């Protein structure tokens, strides 16, 4: 009987790379949305040819590699969104205060995928009402009276009602190529971030 096997250390290294890739994909490529669709051909490939000569011999080495790989994957994921056809605005939707990770994720994805929200951004309309509406139907149990929303660093909503920031200031703040929407559910310690863009008529 003949066969080919690899050393246990090689198996371990492949497992480390696989875990690092899985972790990186979770916080990068799986955190972007353009039109809400996904291709059956969507693929992430990481190739390691050993040419660098770098060796991962300690937990600290592995952690440093994981962080570096995650950074590269996140930047590539952002570029996918930024390179979308006829993109006018790149928007980061950051949800905090979730009671569970899934709760924060559902809220962030609902806002980032909402056609109404995305079209308002294209028209330089902050429209926090559409944002809180998307959070409300996201499928997670949220308390509207606890929700705070900041748009481009300005308070748009506090406790589920309009904040004191003048509407003209909010409208001016979103007239930029990129900005962030911060949504605090004020229910827990979990957070989630999704990267998206504005929606225009084709």
Over which residues does each language-model region extend?
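Flexible, glycine/charged-enriched surface loops at secondary-structure junctions
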Residues: 29-41, 75-92, 118-125, 144-146, ...
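Acidic, glycine-rich loop-and-beta core segments that form the ion-binding/anion-interacting portion
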Residues: 17-73
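Internal helix-turn-beta structural module
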Residues: 106-109, 113-199
């Amino acid at each position: 009987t003949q066969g080919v096997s690899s050393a246990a250390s090689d198996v371990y290294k492949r497992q480390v790379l696989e875990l690092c890739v899985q972790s990186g994909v979770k916080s990068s490529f799986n955190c972007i949305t353009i039109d809400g669709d996904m291709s059956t051909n969507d693929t992430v490939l990481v190739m390691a040819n050993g040419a660098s000569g770098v060796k991962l011999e300690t937990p600290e080495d592995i952690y440093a590699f994981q962080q570096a790989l995650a950074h590269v994957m996140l930047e590539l994921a952002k570029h996918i969104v930024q390179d979308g056809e006829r993109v006018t605005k790149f928007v980061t939707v950051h949800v905090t205060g979730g009671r569970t990770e899934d709760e924060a994720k559902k809220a962030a994805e609902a806002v980032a995928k909402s056609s109404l929200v995305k079209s308002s951004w294209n028209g330089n309309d902050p429209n926090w009402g559409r944002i809180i509406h998307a959070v409300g139907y996201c499928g997670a149990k949220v308390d509207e009276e606890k929700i705070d929303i900041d748009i481009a660093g300005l308070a748009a909503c506090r406790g589920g009602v309009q904040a004191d920031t003048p509407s003209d200031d909010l409208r001016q703040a979103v007239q930029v190529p990129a900005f962030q929407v911060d949504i605090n559910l004020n229910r827990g310690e979990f957070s989630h971030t999704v990267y998206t863009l504005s929606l225009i008529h084709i």
